[in-house]
Amino acid sequence: MSIQIKQSTMVRPAEETPNKSLWLSKIDMILRTPYSHTGAVLIYKQPDNNEDNIHPSSSMYFDANILIEALSKALVPYYPMAGRLKINGDRYEIDCNAEGALFVEAESSHVLEDFGDFRPNDELHRVMVPTCDYSKGISSFPLLMVQLTRFRCGGVSIGFAQHHHACDGMSHFEFNNSWARIAKGLLPALEPVHDRYLHLRLRNPPQIKYTHSQFEPFVPSLPNELLDGKTNKSQTLFKLSREQINTLKQKLDLSSNTTTRLSTYEVVAGHVWRSVSKARGLSDHEEIKLIMPVDGRSRINNPSLPKGYCGNVVFLAVCTATVGDLSCNPLTDTAGKVQEALKGLDDDYLRSAIDHTESKPDLPVPYMGSPEKTLYPNVLVNSWGRIPYQAMDFGWGSPTFFGISNIFYDGQCFLIPSQNGDGSMTLAINLFSSHLSLFKKYFYDF
């Protein structure tokens, strides 16, 4: 699909901002490699009624000048987003130098319908998300890049490339919410807090009470038929309606030892875990891990993180089972394992995890660092259920679609709630193509 870049602007903060280095925690640094950005896409379909398009300050649908001006103002309180990475000794920092965030304006001769259901893939990412040149070193590229793409049908997309060292998904969308509010002439809803050293530094003395095996180096154990590099991976979307989710929950064995009500995420994540293990054709004795990124904001409470904390507070919950147990035991047991793993991430555990990471001079990037780009035999289920995408109204209405632009790792998936509030959810997943049809069979077999 063709795309034409019309203009690229390095947007700097509208006012003078603190010129300093921002200390990053090890939690900031271990989720992704430093030479990578996370891509996400918002889709806005132009309303049929022109009166629904009218912004109080412009008659143009998604006026780039308004977006750029608002972005410049949003970068004042969120000034680290306009900085660059640098290395200080054995760790990364953000040089808050106000060099700016990249804003790209692009056009495409295609219509939004050409992208179908907007499933993540290389083409969607290439057309809608800004690309980055990492060849000039760690301090050469922006931490935030945004692309406004106009399509022949009148609709637009806003693609984000956000650096994970700068912040996690929740902080990123709090920033986007502030940007959107400023574009409408409103004040930001939150005042960001950037001091990570104050809140996530090593305790004195360290209190490491758990093993924290989730931070150990990960080496995928691929079978021979997947080692030749010729087996393709496929990314696709699977939708679960509210009725299907309710049917899945009705399969739970209420007479089991699970005493606490299981959440929708726990049930669906457990179901995905089982379905992937079956689809891969693993032997019954093999172990498969379910890895779940968890927002620690509500779990850290001694002391609590301040509202508006801008940084990474993502921790990994991990549960392990054999393929035989996943296949033979009821879904209630599997979902119960998920619940137990999530409950284990309390304040005591997370503070111990922080001390563990800060005590290590060098930590690998867990799970997201293998050159084969696979989590095999494991699976990672990330929930985007609490990301406030509907707040991304820049003055021309809320997005009609929100999703990840590209999933790079086999076994990685995202659970995204419906945009229209009908109680459904979509699973975006990357699997080896040879496993995909069986996964679909098991995923809908309930």
From Swiss-Prot:
Top-level taxon in the UniProt lineage: Eukaryota
Gene that encodes it: HCBT2
Record has Plastid as a keyword: no
Keywords: Acyltransferase, Flavonoid biosynthesis, Transferase
Main enzyme class: transferase
Catalytic activity, reaction form: anthranilate + benzoyl-CoA = N-benzoylanthranilate + CoA
Induction: By fungal elicitors. Elicitation triggers a rapid, transient induction, reaching maximal abundances within about 0.5 hours and returning to basal levels within 4 hours.
Biological function: Catalyzes the formation of N-benzoylanthranilate, in the course of methoxydianthramide B, a phytoalexin. Phytoalexins are produced in response to infection by parasites, and are essential for the expression of disease resistance.
Entry's EC annotation: 2.3.1.144
Similarity comment: family membership: Belongs to the plant acyltransferase family.
One GO term (biological process): flavonoid biosynthetic process
This protein's name: Anthranilate N-benzoyltransferase protein 2
Pathway connected to this protein: Phytoalexin biosynthesis; methoxydianthramide B biosynthesis
Post-translational modification, as annotated: N-terminus is blocked.
Location of the active site: 164 (proton acceptor), 393 (proton acceptor)
GO molecular-function terms, A-Z: anthranilate N-benzoyltransferase activity
